[in-house]
């Protein structure tokens, strides 16, 4: 499944984020839980919001970020994904069990240091080899003989593992940004 498209129109190319939304939702559903036997229904509900980030200079000279909800973006624009994960089951989900994986869509580059960072609540890891391996930065790629550190702009997936129990009704928010090429 292709997760991004470039649509040509009269004027500049636009990056369609709608297929990305669908693919991200699928990635969430597939990567939602690992290592736990649960009923067939997913105990997690997901909501994804997509914003174009712009910067404006206020009268006092300070810069401020503005967010515009969108389904399309143009090359050079920064897009912020906000993922809301809620435990919709009636049971507490154990710490270390809930994992969320999301792609860095084709046609975009991950913005360094933009993902919800690792903390005592969540571990944030990246992959630069199509999800084969994940690690916290620095992310290494290549064979043993040609091992090198991947630039953050080469990251292809992000994985978060929650180190806290998720109580029924509890919602957690994850964020990351990309730049449209």
Regions found by a protein language model. Name each.
Residues 1-15:
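N-terminal secretory signal peptides that target proteins for export/translocation
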Residues 4, 24-28, 69:
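Exposed boundary/loop context
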Residues 7, 27-31, 57:
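Compositionally biased, low-complexity repeat tracts
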Residues 11, 31-35:
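Residue-identity detector for glycine
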Residues 13-14, 18, 176:
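Structural motif marking the loop-to-transmembrane transition
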Residues 16-32:
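Bacterial N-terminal signal peptides
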